[in-house]
Amino acid sequence: MYDGLKGFREFYPGEMSARREVTDTIETRARRYGFREVGTPALERTQLYVDKSGEEIVEELYAFEDKGGREVSLTPELTPTVARMVVAKQQALAKPVKWFSTRPFWRYEQVQQGRFREFYQTNIDIFGSERPEADAEVLATAADALTDLGLDGADFEFRVSHRDILGGLLAAMDSDVDTTDAIRAVDKREKIDDEEYRSLLVGAGLTHEEADTFDSLLRTDDLSELVEFAGTDRVEAAVENLQAVLDAAADFGVREFCSVSLETARGLDYYTGVVFECFDTSGEVSRSVFGGGRYDDLIESFGGQPTPAVGVGIGHETLSLLCQRAGVWPAEELSTDYYVLTVGDTRDVALDVARELRALGHVVETDLSDRGFGDQLSYADGINAETVVVVGEQDLEDDAVTLKDMASGDQTQVPLAAFPPEEGRPTYDDYA
């Protein structure tokens, strides 16, 4: 007996049906905003993540040497890949470039609530617009996808911040601070205790007093206090940009889902401007549901022309927890429109009926095991068939078939020449 690997899951048809419905809902919303689907590889050169993603991602890579002697890794995230793709065809692409994709990723990390070693994300990115409206459109696409799933403002919030505010405040300190390490500490704030958090800030170069000041500034509700403390154009511009994005979010109708939270940092090194994370407002799903933000320098770092960019990666594992908590996760059940049941030597006619129903777009099953009437009916119940079409020898003598409603058990005979009709999904109720 072979057991599955820890952190890698199988999805049986009922659960997979629910996951497919969620994925389709998100992707439909992305398409309505004009995002185009792309396909990306499962393997990349390991050096791509060493150079672009940061230490935390590199430590979690599924990395190995392939048979050609190349150091490669299973993709742990999408952003570096799509950035590389943009650079490869930058001159030919109409700007802004708006892409999305849904696919699995892999990270060797501790398995816990909403976190697995193989996980699925829908990534939504805009390349080529520095306007705050681009940030707002990404927020709006994500928010609308969540409301399409049945969630509302009582279920989730977007905590919005700005990396240049964090970097500008750190630069205003007297000490020589490692900004990258300090921002990583902020990103871990909700996952560690206060003592460890402050230890990380001090380890990044802040004095204990500066760490207290920095932490206090991140908690302020008055953004003008940040501008006054730093006294720099950098922080002033970042505050203005953050406000502009929030104003644009209001224009898109999603400002109600957004709150300013400077303790939101995002751990990946390539983020540059506005960043955000989605959280369960009840706190039951304790970790970030998903996040995103600006990465304006990444395309240029690949050798491309300077190209502003912003995106979000919607993690399906934590999203499923949020939907389940809110009671909007789709039913995990099989769904079949028709089961065509044969009695006696009627298989040819039954297959003709099934073929016509499928041509109309319906989900149809027939007997593949030469079972009797009772066993076929039990199978139809097991696959949650809505309607059973009985094609029996007696029915055919009457030039008819029998429709049986599986919920009520009621049935009626229907002329074969009139079934199925050219449109609709006929059931017992249409003929009773």
Swiss-Prot record:
Any one GO MF annotation of this record: ATP binding
Keywords from the UniProt entry: Aminoacyl-tRNA synthetase, ATP-binding, Cytoplasm, Ligase, Nucleotide-binding, Protein biosynthesis
SUPFAM superfamilies: Class II aaRS ABD-related, Class II aaRS and biotin synthetases
Coiled coil (residue ranges): none
UniProt region (Disordered), positions on chain: 412-432
Reactions mediated catalytically: tRNA(His) + L-histidine + ATP = L-histidyl-tRNA(His) + AMP + diphosphate + H(+)
Identification of the protein by name: Histidine--tRNA ligase
Organism of provenance: Natronomonas pharaonis (strain ATCC 35678 / DSM 2160 / CIP 103997 / JCM 8858 / NBRC 14720 / NCIMB 2260 / Gabara) (Halobacterium pharaonis)
Name of the gene encoding the protein in the UniProt record: hisS
